[in-house]
Amino acid sequence: MRIALVSSCAVSVPPRAYGGTELVVAELAKNLTRLGHDVTTFATGDSEPAGKLQWRFEKPVWPPHESAELRHAAHAWQAITAPSARFDIVHTHQAPSLAFASIAPSVRTVYTIHHCRDERLIDLYRDFPNATYVGISRRQAELIPEIQIEEVILHGLDPDLYDAGRGDGGYVAFLGRFAPEKGPHFAIDAARRAGVTVRMGGGVHPPDRPFFEREVQARLENGAGGVEWLGELSHAPKLSLLRGARAMLFPIDWEEPFGLVMIESMLVGTPVIGFPHGSVAEVIEEGVTGFVVRDVAEMAARIRDLDGFDRDRCRERAREKWSSLRMAREHEALYERVMTRSQRGRLWSGVHDVSRAGPRAAEARRAEASPSVRRPL
């Protein structure tokens, strides 16, 4: 198949540091190419995906800017709809692309929803029912029932990029944005209750600065100690942090749609201790790859009770369950179904059926195919 992957113009593919969606796009490009497909990624000019690359902006436009994303999407769709392009599937990870897909209804478009429930974007998706929507966790899909999500495909990473760690650093780790929904203040409190140091990797985005100063900086400066902030980390120092940690703390306070850092931790053998929100219960296999706890007190108790945890078993289970090759194969199967459905519709009508892009499209699609959900093994 000839496949176009449309990413954002805000972060490189793969990302240098922050950028979970862009890491997934990079893994898709790599493994779809490995499976024999002709892949073109639309991203920033400094990106290095497998296959071909096209770009509108040489460097990432950060912070994200709506105007830049629209120009990036316009550039991508100009190339996608060129007579010589002949893409079989366009898989976009960027919302503005949907507007361009709507004026090219003959282009088979797949869109992955990477975010939690957002009323503004739900209205956008309702306007473009001709796309095939993909979710990244069952919980995410449950929270946006208005959208016909055809399939849930859980993320995956390249296990060979994650060497085993011994967890002998004597600390627990936190990785993520220093934002209220990520719970860095809860991680500090749990580690202090457990009597261990917490080493923290992550950046502070401008909207989260007041929270950081009020909840995190205040804890760092209160004299209790036991906290090391490492700043935002690229791949190598992030792995070093995870490999030496006794556990990775994931005390989120929101409906996180997935959380790639959980499987990164598991792939080096470090268990994840997380609060029961969003996809956490889908990703953590209790007692094997981590533990789901209800609050800071339970998190602290679990930190103190990690002696005897089988890191080798954790890592092997993660390698079986969370590989990006598995993720790519599931996408490949979805693309094939989308193509088959499209070809069947054209044979039935003899011409392009413009109703596929209209208000009845979602209803017609439901009649053709029942939604499928990929569940964890």
Predicted regions and their residues:
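Catalytic cores of nucleotide-sugar-dependent glycosyltransferases that transfer UDP/GDP/TDP-activated
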Residues: M1-A361, R365-E368, V373-L377
